[in-house]
Amino acid sequence: MPKLTASEQTEFLSTPGILMRIACLRADGSPLITPIWFIHHENAIYFTPRAQSEWLGCLRQDSRIGLCIDEQDLPYRKVIIEGQAELIHDLGEDDLWRDLYRQIAGRYVPADAAEAYVQNTIDQERALWCVPLTGSTVKSWRMPLDGEPANGIWHQRYYAPGTHFSDS
């Protein structure tokens, strides 16, 4: 599958309504995967765990994280990010970043509903975390578009040697 160009990746990560799944580790080493809202801002992925969310505790104890952002329709764009989550604002500092919270909510619901959501949950503390793209492992791909080679549907490493689309 072709890798997304830098502009395709930025456009995709800015597309409203696409959920992100985060993967982090529980204290016992078992994985925890959660679908959440996010925003791509200043070359980083920002997200906001609630005070009572299990994954906030996981990130506090081990900030290694995997992020999966993908779409359900053609061309099935995907971005996988593996890196370290960084705490930007802790619980109780919500007023310092509330405008970004509105922007995050506004990616998923209309502006009036986003404002209502923020106001209705204003007394519920959240933390603000991010994963910078620089310094993280970022992989992206999509289905081949019209006019692109059909063998691009898979990466070359997946074709068995000597088969139709293999290089050997």
Which functions belong to the PLM regions below?
Residues L13-S14, R60-Q61, I122-D123:
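Alpha-helix boundary recognition
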Residues M1-R21:
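Short, basic/aromatic recognition patches
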Residues P16, D62-S63, I104-R107:
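Alpha-helix boundary/capping residues
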Residues G17-A51, G57-L59, I65-E71, K78-I80:
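Short beta-strand segments
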Residues Q9, S30-L32, P110:
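Short, flexible segments with low predicted structural confidence
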